[in-house]
Amino acid sequence: MTRRVKTGIPGVDEILHGGIPERNVVLLSGGPGTGKTIFSQQFLWNGLKMGEPGIYVALEEHPVQVRQNMAQFGWDVKPYEEKGMFAMVDAFTAGIGKSKEYEKYIVHDLTDIREFIEVLRQAIRDINAKRVVVDSVTTLYINKPAMARSIILQLKRVLAGTGCTSIFVSQVSVGERGFGGPGVEHGVDGIIRLDLDEIDGELKRSLIVWKMRGTSHSMRRHPFDITDKGIIVYPDKVLKRGKVLEL
């Protein structure tokens, strides 16, 4: 039996029939405002509460901002950082400004994937990480889309090899059918897609699991909400032709 890693996000483990299989790399794909970052941070935070060390790789936002945003949901990672259970990899500032005084793990040149992987590997070793979030993986190949699948596979090799279960946040434009980068869907073990659709003049949030190696899962599109405590998914409801139906 494959060991499961519980996301701890209400409704998600039910949809995944018990959680994410250990060592899986999951692409969390969606357009702007769909809740990808919140989902990934909630996954890390719940891991910390379960005693599983975690790493957040910040590519889109200043690490200080990331910590502040997490704290707004009541997810204060600072005590865990001090205990050596949580690490932030700064792949945003390139070590410019004050971050070089505050951040322990800094990627100076994002075009150098080897440096990126080495910094990440060091952080994993130092805290014995079990969960890793890369937000967003799209940033790594935004200027070289042809490299997307290769970069995903290089990262996957390191993460699965160190026993981590990982979420790669992937950005897609509004209305895009793909998952954010050519061939990336073939390089990962799982794909969870978050959507925000306008239905009768109202925006509705939904989640669907496109694939997940090592487990069966719900094949339906489930509605979810973002609250002041994070994401809540409704496994007993389904979004169908713009209407929320009870299962």
UniProtKB/Swiss-Prot annotation:
Signal sequence span per UniProt?
Answer: none
Query: Pfam families attached here?
Result: ATPase
Family matches, as InterPro entries = AAA+_ATPase, KaiC-like_dom, KaiC_dom, P-loop_NTPase, UPF0273_KaiC-like
Provide any one GO MF term from the record: ATP hydrolysis activity
Q: Where does ATP bind?
A: G30, G31, P32, G33, T34, G35, K36, T37
Q: Which CDD domains match?
A: KaiC_arch
Answer yes or no on keyword 4Fe-4S: no
Keyword annotations = ATP-binding, Nucleotide-binding
Keyword Hydrolase among record annotations: no
Q: Which residues form the KaiC domain?
A: 3-247
Record family assignment: Belongs to the UPF0273 family.
**Name of protein:** UPF0273 protein PH0284
Q: Which organism is it from?
A: Pyrococcus horikoshii (strain ATCC 700860 / DSM 12428 / JCM 9974 / NBRC 100139 / OT-3)
**What does the organism's lineage look like at the top?**
Archaea, Methanobacteriati, Methanobacteriota, Thermococci, Thermococcales
